[in-house]
Amino acid sequence: MSRIGKRIIEIPSSVQASVEGSKLLFKNGKEKHELETHNRVKITLENNQLSFQPVGEDAQSRAYWGTYGALANNIVIGLSTGFSKILEVNGVGYKVALGNKTLDLSLGFSHPVKYPIPAGIEMVVEKNTITIKGSDKQKVGQVAAEIRSFRPPEPYKGKGVKYSDEVIIRKAGKTAKK
């Protein structure tokens, strides 16, 4: 029995939800999300409460049950409060600036890295900290991972782009021979 799937999702008043066949539609004042579900999952929406039930008793139906419960919950949380990731840029001469629909990064390369900000994502830059905000959890995480991949933190001095809660395991450098 799926612990995630059997949980009932409370839909706040700021989010409107509707079911059209196997599609779930969510929207708040400015954004809209759609979730296409599999036919092995039954959707029930009553009194601003969303629940899922597996159609069969096989393992595949139970797997879809939990998956779609988690995806719908993430959409509701994203539309009501939103998701955010914080990245820190560490290193001498490493700089971050917010341009016109681009994020400009100076990460020690011979050229500046320009990252186009995708639709639905908002970025705030303070000193060497990048805050990525959005309503789509997958998109926020993907953008953060792409920015981090330009210069991941290295284990000797810790220079690079890292998540704010990431712990870098440091290595000792070479020792001199006597």
UniProtKB/Swiss-Prot annotation:
Pfam families: Ribosomal_L6. One of its GO terms (biological process) is cytoplasmic translation. Keywords: Ribonucleoprotein, Ribosomal protein, RNA-binding, rRNA-binding. PROSITE patterns: RIBOSOMAL_L6_1. GO terms for cellular component: cytosolic large ribosomal subunit. GO terms for molecular function: rRNA binding; structural constituent of ribosome. Part of the 50S ribosomal subunit. Belongs to the universal ribosomal protein uL6 family. This protein binds to the 23S rRNA, and is important in its secondary structure. It is located near the subunit interface in the base of the L7/L12 stalk, and near the tRNA binding site of the peptidyltransferase center. PANTHER family: 60S/50S RIBOSOMAL PROTEIN L6/L9 (PTHR11655), LARGE RIBOSOMAL SUBUNIT PROTEIN UL6M (PTHR11655:SF14). This is Large ribosomal subunit protein uL6.
